[in-house]
């Protein structure tokens, strides 16, 4: 018995298929089954392209994340919790191969299991679980302070060798392919179900895309902008939620309308904090960023993306998501310009912003101010520091025109820009330091004439003859 079937639009056909193929189907069941099978075939053909395109965008945003040093020296990290919402992957797997950002102390006897700066290998990961440790602070790509790329300590193990990652490994491309490739697998797996109603994976892939592009989700749930007491008023169309904070002067009040069909997650007279989810549905990462800050927004995106993959039994290490999110979060938006030549509302990388401010401060001027933002992968690629990489991705004419007008220079730190101009890419597979490939003269500027002179071209032509 095949059960309920999806029609070509993805809606459920109300009458299920009760017969089996041995006994034979009725006319209605046969037509419904054929439509379901056709949907499966067309889905796998069309949606494979979507998964491939997602991989391309992920590679484009992260190709310049390469291991550039052994240790950046940062003291910060991220906290990995044993009980982490709806995560199904074991605690052991989430801390294995990471570097501890602070001492991990046993809950039983207060002994130090892992010292700060040590790798959490198999025996230590087991000891952490046995000693009832509920949270571990580990180094992360999100908190690495390397100017370009990331350091080996913040990345941790390369799981192909089960030891610390070598210098020069292109971890950005590895992360993009680790996330994108299962997307292709998921999409192609739809065909095997032949339109039978179940958790259709093609609903999962658009969800991952939605998260990485920082889009406002369709099934949006409001979050409280302020802390305060909830008052719920039922109307004909839905619920009117009021959050009031009477402790401040003047008192604050926010109103939210929630449709009747949506399940509420708070009760009348509940006290909520800023950022509390008020109803069932997805949150907008931009709201979390505004209310709770960049760290909470990053945690939400990782948790939601992992939920999609883990529901299909696909295990992807968190560090791959962290590498992509590092690139999504490396821009700032200019608020005040000071004595710089920047424009309010411009997007600029943190590295470039700090360089410009340092130069202005050295001259005794007033620095610019900015706030950190999180961009979707497409937008982040287009606002890359490398105009060669951005132009080879999308909107080529626009990117090149702006690069010429601003006299931008390209430091050639990523893979794409070096491939385009025919140089060696700044990576190494055997642990050799790729820094020699990143010398200061390797800067390609749109403001200078880099074309060969006429005599050298004529000489080359005569040599070929």
Name every feature range the model reports, one short phrase each.
Residues 1-465:
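Intrinsically disordered, low-complexity regulatory segments
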């Amino acid at each position: 018995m095949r059960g309920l079937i999806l029609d070509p639009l993805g809606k459920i056909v109300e009458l299920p298929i009760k017969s089996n193929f041995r006994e034979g189907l009725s006319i209605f069941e046969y037509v419904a089954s054929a439509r379901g099978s056709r949907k499966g075939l067309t889905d796998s053909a069309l949606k494979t392209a979507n998964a491939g395109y997602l991989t391309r965008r992920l590679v484009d945003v992260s190709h310049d994340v390469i291991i550039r040093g052994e240790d950046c020296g940062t003291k910060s990290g991220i906290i990995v919790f044993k009980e982490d919402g709806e995560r199904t992957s074991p605690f052991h797997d989430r801390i294995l191969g990471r570097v501890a950002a602070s001492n991990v102390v046993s809950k039983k006897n207060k002994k130090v299991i892992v010292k700060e700066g040590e790798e959490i290998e198999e025996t230590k990961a087991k000891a952490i679980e046995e000693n009832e440790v509920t949270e571990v602070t580990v180094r992360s790509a999100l908190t690495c302070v390397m100017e370009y790329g990331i350091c080996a300590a913040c990345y941790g193990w390369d799981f192909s060798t089960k030891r610390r990652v070598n210098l020069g490994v292109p971890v950005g491309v590895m992360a993009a392919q680790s996330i994108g490739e299962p997307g292709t697998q998921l999409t192609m797996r739809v065909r095997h179900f032949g339109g039978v109603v179940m958790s259709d994976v093609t609903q999962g892939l658009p969800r991952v895309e939605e998260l990485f592009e920082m889009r406002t989700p369709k099934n949006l749930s409001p979050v409280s902008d302020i802390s305060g007491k909830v008052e719920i008023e039922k109307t004909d169309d839905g619920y009117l939620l009021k959050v009031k904070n009477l402790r401040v002067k003047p008192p604050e009040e926010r109103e939210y309308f929630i449709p009747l069909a949506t399940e509420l997650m708070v009760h009348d007279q509940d006290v909520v904090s800023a950022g509390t989810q008020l109803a069932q549905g997805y949150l907008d990462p931009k709201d979390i960023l505004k209310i709770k800050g960049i760290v909470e927004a990053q945690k939400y995106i990782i948790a939601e993306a992992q939920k999609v993959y883990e529901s299909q039994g696909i295990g992807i290490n968190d560090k791959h998501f962290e590498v992509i999110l590092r690139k999504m979060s490396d821009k700032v938006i200019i608020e005040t310009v000071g004595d710089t030549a920047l424009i309010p509302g411009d997007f600029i990388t943190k590295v470039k912003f700090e360089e410009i401010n340092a130069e202005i401060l050295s001259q005794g001027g007033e620095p610019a101010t900015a706030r950190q933002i999180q961009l979707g992968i497409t937008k982040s690629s287009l606002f890359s520091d490398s105009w060669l990489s951005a132009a080879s991705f999308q909107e080529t004419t626009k990117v090149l025109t702006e690069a010429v007008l601003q006299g931008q220079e390209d430091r050639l730190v990523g893979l794409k820009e070096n491939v385009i101009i025919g140089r060696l890419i700044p990576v190494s597979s055997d642990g050799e330091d790729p820094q020699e490939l990143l010398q200061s003269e390797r800067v390609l500027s749109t403001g200078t004439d880099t074309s060969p002179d006429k005599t050298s071209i004529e000489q080359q032509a005569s040599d070929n003859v």
